[in-house]
Swiss-Prot record:
<dbReference type="Pfam" id="PF08626">
    <property type="entry name" value="TRAPPC9-Trs120"/>
</dbReference>
<dbReference type="GO" id="GO:0005802">
    <property type="term" value="C:trans-Golgi network"/>
</dbReference>
<keyword id="KW-0333">Golgi apparatus</keyword>
<feature type="modified residue" description="Phosphoserine">
    <location>
        <position position="944"/>
    </location>
</feature>
<dbReference type="InterPro" id="IPR013935">
    <property type="entry name" value="TRAPP_II_complex_Trs120"/>
</dbReference>
<dbReference type="GO" id="GO:0030154">
    <property type="term" value="P:cell differentiation"/>
</dbReference>
<dbReference type="GO" id="GO:0005783">
    <property type="term" value="C:endoplasmic reticulum"/>
</dbReference>
<keyword id="KW-0963">Cytoplasm</keyword>
<protein>
    <recommendedName>
        <fullName>Trafficking protein particle complex subunit 9</fullName>
    </recommendedName>
</protein>
<keyword id="KW-0221">Differentiation</keyword>
<comment type="similarity">
    <text>Belongs to the NIBP family.</text>
</comment>
<keyword id="KW-0256">Endoplasmic reticulum</keyword>
<keyword id="KW-0597">Phosphoprotein</keyword>
<feature type="modified residue" description="Phosphoserine">
    <location>
        <position position="557"/>
    </location>
</feature>
<comment type="subunit">
    <text>Component of the multisubunit TRAPP (transport protein particle) complex, which includes at least TRAPPC2, TRAPPC2L, TRAPPC3, TRAPPC3L, TRAPPC4, TRAPPC5, TRAPPC8, TRAPPC9, TRAPPC10, TRAPPC11 and TRAPPC12. Directly interacts with IKBKB and MAP3K14.</text>
</comment>
<comment type="function">
    <text>Functions as an activator of NF-kappa-B through increased phosphorylation of the IKK complex. May function in neuronal cells differentiation. May play a role in vesicular transport from endoplasmic reticulum to Golgi.</text>
</comment>
Length: 1138
């Protein structure tokens, strides 16, 4: 026997072997359809008996193996079933002849045979025959199973007769010597009458009868015969048959202990009798003795238990039997099959280590020269048995050996598909799976070097199969999962091979389905490059949408009727943590930053890298990048445009590396850091681009509010100068610009500003709205810088050192602090024209212009954008007022304001006020200018804290009053300067310069006195009269104070001024009063008026002056002297007309 049956198991010893073969030409499909139905009848109960008969079917069985039927009866072909097609009666004789030829092949061992004929109808088919069954077709053959049962019963009859014949004790008869084929020549010439020979014959026959009893369902009798045979054969050292007897004993014991079988076949063997399930469950318990259907006598069960081996003894007897087989070179197949049977029993007993010893012995059993197909079968069975005992890696090893055997060089047509299929089956044994997700779970499992070798073999096998897509998938899997174990050279080799493959068949993310139904998942390159962090970026500051504030406040939601709900606030914490608190805008380019790392020892080119999103229609704009070798963390920004609104989730990214397209999901990336992957997309908004007439600034403003400045512009102005800033607004978006608001915020707080620094008018610009995409609108912003024009202390010191002497009141007051030099002041450099060591007087003003605009669908939803323009203004000093004072004018309603003006520029400068002549000042020159001004009525400003409650204290009130007065005075003065060489002009302000004393001199008294001579007001001009004519004199009082005043008594004193400092008051001979020289005024209410009248008579010609003075009585003493400022009266007496 040269062909081992690797599917053998211990329970096969009780089966009858039936061969099913086709006769003539029968299609494979039809043959196996009937074969499947025939093989379903594998166990039947014998009539009138409680025994069961088991059948083992084979469609191919070497005839020479039947020659070992005396050695082990289950190897003998006892039944033959042939299947044939016959559609004509003419073919019937030839087919029947072939049937007889087929029977002759197994004729020496056959008990019975059958021929199943399909397709023949007519007279021949209607003849009743026991050995032939006719059926019209393969579909119309309902009695096949019944015919097989009858056939098996006929086999049982022959088997039973043989058993009875061999088991009957025939005293005196000579027992024949049963031999195996290779023994026949060894027994020629032996003494057949010797006692040793007779024992040998008896022992072998006892063993043979035990086999027949086991096949006939008589388990007890078989155990008895096996024991007797063992004793007889051991005594004569017949080791080969002793091993067979021991194996038979083991098989019978296995059948008793393990009624479910050891071969792992579907379904357990069924035993007749209703008590079978209970006894099968209890059979493994010591002392649980039940019948197995032979008879109901418990004594038989006791006897069987005594003769039956224990589970431990079964293995010992198997070892002994195999040791006897090993003594015979020609018994290698028997030894190999015994090892396989023992392994299956040990697998049931979960004794893996002992089973591995039997398998190791089976590996080294030397058989004849096996064919390549037999080698493949042998290694495959060894693999299955190692898998059965839990030795997965050993199983995978032999499976891989079988795979390599399929493509051995000696095979003319290598079976690459079979090789590939076997290699796939080895993967679990080497802790490999074809799902790359399994390699993201914890540490690497398995032997990486072996795994890489196996994956390389899969790549090669799939290529030889002619499936390049499969090669690309396996090579991609190798690169992705084994990257950490590849050397630098191996990385280069693998990637080069991958590029060669993908040049013909690009790698995709589709599932690959193999012919056997196995699917290979896609392999995304999550390590090429490695992504460590993903961050969704906010839009640029100028494009970030902002929500218009509701009048109800931000805590009120339109979706909930409740002001506060803890359910809303605390639910879905995980989902909230992934959602980002800024928004993207429909139609705008949005960015996601990835920190990537190239683990390869060479430059990595990544093509077509873009974002994977869900929830919103998103147009990803692919990028291509090249990462240097082992680059470290490298920032990469991926962009895209959301096309619709809603909530968008960035789920990953896609790449094309080495020709393999990958979809990499963030959830499958190990160790990745992300601040969130979900963001809200709001409706589209317009995009505003701003350009100005000023140059961009190198200074970057940093507002304390944290606002981002998109554009910075700068300008250099002289103090008091005004610059026009033209702002160009262009709608570069796709939505109309419908709303625009402009606000400003001054960032500089150290410098005191006077007047409006920035001013504009939007009416004409807004008239052009809505501003359609691509359209432009402009408007003008006026930049007016008016800082303090007073001189700083350090500059005053410089002037004093230069010998410049100025008089008047110092420029400091209780209500104004002198500005100290700033810490950031630095020497003026050569570009600014200052002398070395001269302090810098350039000041800086910074402001932010905010353009709040909206339009389109986003405006409907209440969103807007804010664009910030930073303005940096460097203010150089133009002129300084170093001293200020006043002089009275000829009119009581006017005075002279004296200003010492210093030219702080490096250019010639002219200063003027109103329409007066301009004063020319050279660089660094100081001159005094006098300006005649009308006195001011300041009574419209609050007098006390009680009059204006918003001022916290009297000091603050007084400061406000000072500023208001300074503003009014400055508006009337209209002081301006011009630098002709630069063609630059500006204004100079006295705001903040005037101290309290100067203000008092510039203020109109609360009591307004008017003197009229002959009805004409007399203030600074002489009133003419005739000598001898009475002159009417009227004094009027207007009370502008908030209180009532009076009564007053006034005296008129005439005098003459000789223009040499001498005044003559003794004018009784020259001036005469008509009536009394004293005038009386009654009490005058607030805003009221009063007047008193008198007359004078001038007797001589000349210039006379009238001095009106008050009597120092009670009412006049309560008021300050400045309230009684009456104009000087000049009367010129002329010759009387003739």
């Amino acid at each position: 026997m040269s062909v081992p049956d690797y599917m053998q198991c211990a329970e096969d010893h009780q089966t009858l072997l039936v061969v099913v073969q086709p006769v003539g030409i029968v299609s494979e499909e039809n043959f196996f359809r009937i074969y499947k139905r025939i093989s379903s009848v594998s166990q039947i109960s014998v009539r009138d008996s409680q025994r069961a008969l088991y059948i083992r079917y084979r469609h191919h069985y070497p005839p020479e193996n039947s020659e070992w039927g005396d050695f082990q009866t289950h190897r003998k072909v006892v039944g033959l079933i042939t299947i044939t097609d016959c559609f004509s009666a003419k073919d019937w004789p030839q087919i029947f002849e072939k049937f007889h030829v087929q029977k002759e092949i197994y004729g020496s061992t056959l008990y019975d045979s059958r021929l199943f004929v399909f397709g023949l109808q007519g007279e021949i088919a209607e003849q009743p025959r026991t050995d032939v069954a006719f059926y019209p077709s393969y579909e119309d053959c309902a009695t096949v199973e019944k015919r097989i049962e009858d056939f098996v019963e006929s086999l049982f009859i022959v088997l039973e007769s043989k058993r009875l014949d061999r088991a009957t004790d025939k005293s005196g008869d000579k027992i024949p010597l049963l031999c195996v084929p290779f023994e026949k020549k060894d027994f020629v010439g032996l003494d057949t009458d010797s006692r040793h020979y007779k024992k040998r014959c008896q022992g072998r026959m006892r063993k043979h009868v035990g086999d027949l009893c086991l096949q006939a369902g008589m388990l007890q009798d078989s155990l008895v015969h096996y024991h007797m045979s063992v004793e007889l054969l051991r005594s004569v050292n017949d080791f080969l048959w002793l091993g067979a007897a021991l194996e038979g004993l083991c098989s019978a014991s296995v059948i008793y202990h393990y009624p479910g079988g050891t071969g792992g076949k579907a379904g357990a063997r069924r035993f007749p009798g209703s008590a079978l399930p209970a006894e099968a469950a209890n059979r493994h318990r010591p002392g649980a003795l039940t019948t197995n259907g032979i008879n109901a006598d418990t004594s038989t069960e006791i006897g069987r238990a005594k003769n039956c081996l224990s589970p431990e003894d079964i293995i010992e007897k198997y070892k002994e039997a195999i040791s006897y087989y090993s003594k015979y070179k020609n018994a290698g197949v028997i030894e190999l099959e015994a090892c396989v049977k023992a392994v299956r029993v040990l697998a049931i007993q979960k004794r893996s280590m002992e089973a591995s010893e039997f398998l190791q012995n089976a590996v080294y059993i030397n058989l004849r020269q096996l064919s390549e197909e037999e080698k493949i079968q042998r290694y495959s069975i060894l693999s299955e048995l190692y898998e059965l005992i839990g030795f997965h890696r050993k199983s995978a090893f032999f499976k891989r050996v079988a795979a390599m055997q399929c493509v051995a060089p000696s095979i003319s047509e290598p079976g690459w598909r079979a090789c590939y299929k076997l290699l796939l089956e080895t993967l679990p044994g080497y802790s490999l799976s074809l799902d790359p997700q399994d390699f993201n779970k914890g540490t690497h499992r398995g032997w990486a070097a072996v795994q890489m070798r196996l994956l390389h073999e899969l790549v090669y096998a799939s290529r030889r199969m002619g499936n390049p897509a499969l090669s690309v998938r396996h090579l991609s899997f190798l690169l992705q999962t084994m990257l950490d174990f590849l050397s630098d050279q191996e990385k280069k080799d693998v990637t080069q091979s991958l590029e060669n493959y993908t040049s013909k068949c690009p790698g995709t993310m589709e599932l690959l389905t193999l012919p056997d139904g196995l699917t290979l998942p896609p392999v995304p390159f999550t390590k090429l490059p490695i992504v460590r962090r993903v961050k969704l970026l906010d839009l640029p500051a100028s494009l970030r949408p902002q929500k218009m504030k509701s009048s109800l406040g931000p805590s009120v939601s339109a979706k909930s009727p409740f002001i506060y709900s803890p359910i809303i606030a605390h639910s879905r914490g995980e989902e909230r943590s992934k959602k980002i608190d800024f928004q993207w805008v429909q139609g705008d380019v949005c960015e996601v930053q990835l920190m990537v790392y190239n683990p390869m020892p060479f430059e990595l080119r990544v093509e077509n890298m873009g974002l994977l999103t869900s929830g919103v229609e998103f147009e990803s704009l692919p990028a291509a990048l090249s990462l240097p070798a082992e680059s470290g963390l490298y920032p990469v920004t991926l962009v895209g445009v959301p096309q619709t609104t809603g909530t968008i989730t960035v789920s990953g990214y896609h790449t094309t590396v080495f020709g393999v397209f990958s979809d990499c999901l963030l959830d499958s990336l190990p160790g990745i850091k992300t601040s969130g992957s979900t963001v809200e997309v709001i409706p589209a908004l317009p995009r505003l681009q701003i350009s100005t007439s000023l140059p961009r600034s190198a200074h970057s403003l940093q507002p304390s509010s944290g606002d981002k400045i998109s554009t910075n512009v700068s300008v250099q102005l002289y103090n008091g100068e005004t610059q026009q800033l033209v702002v160009r607004l262009e709608n570069i978006g796709m939505e109309p610009l419908e709303k625009l608001e402009v606000t400003s915020k001054i960032l500089t707080t150290k410098e005191k500003l006077y007047g409006d620094f920035l001013s504009w008018k939007l009416e004409d610009t807004l008239a052009q709205f809505p501003l359609q995409p691509g359209k432009v609108a402009t408007f003008t912003i006026s930049i007016k810088v008016k800082l303090d024009f007073s001189c700083q202390e350090n500059l005053l010191q410089d002037l004093s050192d230069d010998g410049i002497s100025v008089s008047g009141f110092p420029l400091c007051s209780p209500f104004r602090q002198v500005v100290r030099p700033r810490v950031e002041s630095k020497p003026v450099n050569a570009a600014e024209g200052g002398r070395p060591g001269e302090p810098c007087h350039v000041k800086t003003l910074e402001a932010v212009l905010n353009f709040k605009y909206s339009g389109g669908p986003g405006h409907v939803e209440g969103y807007y954008r804010n664009l910030a323009l930073g303005l940096h203004v460097e203010v150089e000093p133009s002129v300084f007022f170093t001293r200020v004072s006043t002089l009275p004018a000829t009119s009581t309603r006017q005075c002279h304001l004296l200003l010492d003006v210093f030219n702080a520029t490096e250019h010639e400068l002219s200063v003027g006020a109103r329409s007066d002549e301009e004063l020319i000042l050279h660089a660094g020159e100081c001159q005094r200018m006098a300006i005649q001004v009308d006195k001011f009525n300041f009574e419209s400003f609050p007098e006390s804290p009680a009059d204006k409650g918003q001022f916290a204290n009297s000091k603050h009130l007084e400061e406000e009053r000072q500023e208001a007065r300074g503003l009014e005075i400055n508006s009337k003065l209209d002081i301006h300067w011009t630098i002709p060489s630069l063609k630059r002009t500006g204004e100079a302000s006295v705001e903040g310069l005037l101290n309290q004393l100067v203000l008092e001199h510039l203020q109109l008294a609360p009591l307004l006195w008017d003197v009229l001579v002959d009805g004409q007001p007399c203030d600074c001009q002489a009133a003419a009269c005739r000598v001898g004519d009475p002159v009417r004199l009227e004094v009027r009082l207007t009370n502008r104070s908030p209180r009532s005043v009076g009564p007053f008594a006034l005296s008129v004193v005439p005098f003459q001024d000789h223009q040499n400092g001498v005044h003559s008051y003794d004018l009784r001979h020259a001036v005469s009063f008509v009536g009394s020289g004293t005038f009386y005024l009654d009490k005058v209410q607030p805003s009221g008026q009063a007047a008193c009248l008198g007359a004078l008579l001038f007797l001589y010609t000349g210039d006379f002056f009238l001095h009106i003075r008050f009597h120092e009585d009670g009412p006049s003493k309560e008021l300050p002297p400045s309230w009684f400022c009456l104009p000087s009266v000049h009367v010129r007496a002329l010759e009387a007309q003739a």
